[in-house]
Amino acid sequence: MTGLCDSHLHTPLCGHATGTPREYAQAALDAGLSGLCFTDHMPMPRWYDAPWRMKLEQLPEYIAEIQAVQQEFAGRLDVRLGLEADFHPGTEKFVEKVLGMFDWDYVIGSVHYLGAWGFDNPEFVAEYEERDLGGLYRDYYALVEGAARSGLFDAIGHLDLPKKFGHLDPDPVYALHALDVVAGQGLALDFNTAGWRKPVAEAYPAPDLVRAAAERGIPFVLGSDAHQPGEVGFRFADAVKEIRDVGGRTVTFRHRKMQP
């Protein structure tokens, strides 16, 4: 897999990942990758999702840890530094402030909450049985469109995340409209192989959405969403084939600029 970069991975600072940044970098080398970009969950206001992300005061520690890995692996592995940010209405100013604190390489914009419901958290999966799936996906993709229009992010994370536990979208109309917005804003999509490790057993986005995105000229950024070193580069050969089979392309980011 020479030449490939894993641009979605986490560190223990988020509270739900294991392994040191150095171990992730070594795993990338062992997998034959040429680079990786750390994108740990960014700090948010204290009332928001606090157990699942670093605190604001830990941000310098995160930066220092990755810079140490950059130095150690220089000449062997292209190590970049980014964030996975959340789009949640009302927090945009806070996110903008954090994004202005450092020269990040890549910022993913993800939606993990519908109101107060963390819909990708296994602890709250029973809530799906109380929801109308059509309305759920309508509301979710409205937030994705908000993320795309916000100007805060470089790519949209795990596009069809609500399918994680097998609750599939009954109508693609909202997803396709969201793709129109993503394309119009010039953003990329996180091709997130973690879906192959989840109950849905399907990468994010689904194959039909990968094709639809490629038809709209939206590029993909490969990401394993690794929360442990053994997940780095997970099924990247399959990901590349799926993207290329529909005429899509992959990119990476450096200093918030898209690179082929």
UniProtKB/Swiss-Prot annotation:
<comment type="similarity">
    <text>Belongs to the PHP hydrolase family. HisK subfamily.</text>
</comment>
<comment type="pathway">
    <text>Amino-acid biosynthesis; L-histidine biosynthesis; L-histidine from 5-phospho-alpha-D-ribose 1-diphosphate: step 8/9.</text>
</comment>
<dbReference type="Pfam" id="PF13263">
    <property type="entry name" value="PHP_C"/>
</dbReference>
<dbReference type="GO" id="GO:0000105">
    <property type="term" value="P:L-histidine biosynthetic process"/>
</dbReference>
<dbReference type="GO" id="GO:0004401">
    <property type="term" value="F:histidinol-phosphatase activity"/>
</dbReference>
<dbReference type="Pfam" id="PF02811">
    <property type="entry name" value="PHP"/>
</dbReference>
<keyword id="KW-0028">Amino-acid biosynthesis</keyword>
<dbReference type="InterPro" id="IPR016195">
    <property type="entry name" value="Pol/histidinol_Pase-like"/>
</dbReference>
<keyword id="KW-0368">Histidine biosynthesis</keyword>
<protein>
    <recommendedName>
        <fullName>Probable histidinol-phosphatase</fullName>
        <ecNumber>3.1.3.15</ecNumber>
    </recommendedName>
</protein>
<keyword id="KW-0378">Hydrolase</keyword>
<dbReference type="InterPro" id="IPR010140">
    <property type="entry name" value="Histidinol_P_phosphatase_HisJ"/>
</dbReference>
<dbReference type="InterPro" id="IPR004013">
    <property type="entry name" value="PHP_dom"/>
</dbReference>
